[in-house]
UniProtKB/Swiss-Prot annotation:
Its cofactor is pyruvate. GO terms for biological process: alanine biosynthetic process; pantothenate biosynthetic process. GO terms for molecular function: aspartate 1-decarboxylase activity. It is found in: Cytoplasm. It catalyses: L-aspartate + H(+) = beta-alanine + CO2. Pfam families: Asp_decarbox. Keywords: Autocatalytic cleavage, Cytoplasm, Decarboxylase, Lyase, Pantothenate biosynthesis, Pyruvate, Schiff base, Zymogen. Signal peptide: none annotated. Gene3D superfamilies: 2.40.40.20. This is Aspartate 1-decarboxylase. It comes from Neisseria meningitidis serogroup B (strain ATCC BAA-335 / MC58). One of its GO terms (cellular component) is cytosol. Is synthesized initially as an inactive proenzyme, which is activated by self-cleavage at a specific serine bond to produce a beta-subunit with a hydroxyl group at its C-terminus and an alpha-subunit with a pyruvoyl group at its N-terminus.
Length: 127
């Protein structure tokens, strides 16, 4: 049996752009993708902390060190520049793999620069 588990997360990133006329997806600074173990074109879930919207799309690698978080296409209707989002990828793991699995949780500052990388979130943690 396989279970769907958190693979990587970019926690509380600030939306820098929203481009309605782009074909689709989310553009993310390549440094953030690497740190979270998320690949270009990988399916991700997005949560908008400002309005509660949850949606799925895929990633496009943005310029390294740019801090870019840009929602493209229809997803641009669900965010505004300055909104705080959580970007999550998931992995399929077998029961034996679960015990050794540690997700990569990337904590960022207000400029989308890496503040810390953790693998465990205790209950009721405020980050």
């Amino acid at each position: 049996m396989f279970r769907t588990m958190l693979g990587g997360k970019i926690h509380r990133a600030t939306v820098t752009e929203a481009d309605l006329n782009y074909v689709g997806s989310i553009t993310v600074d390549q440094d953030l993708l690497d740190a979270a173990g998320i690949y270009p074109n990988e399916k991700v879930a997005i949560v908008n902390n400002n309005n509660g919207e949850r949606f799925e799309t895929y990633t496009i690698a943005g310029k390294r060190g740019s801090g870019v978080i840009c929602l493209n296409g229809a997803a641009a209707r669900l965010v505004q520049k300055g909104d705080i989002v959580i970007i999550m990828s998931y992995v399929q793991l077998s029961e034996p793999e679960i015990a050794a699995h540690e997700p990569k949780v990337v904590l960022v500052d207000g400029n989308n620069k890496i503040r810390d990388i953790i693998s465990y979130e205790p209950p009721h943690t405020v980050l």
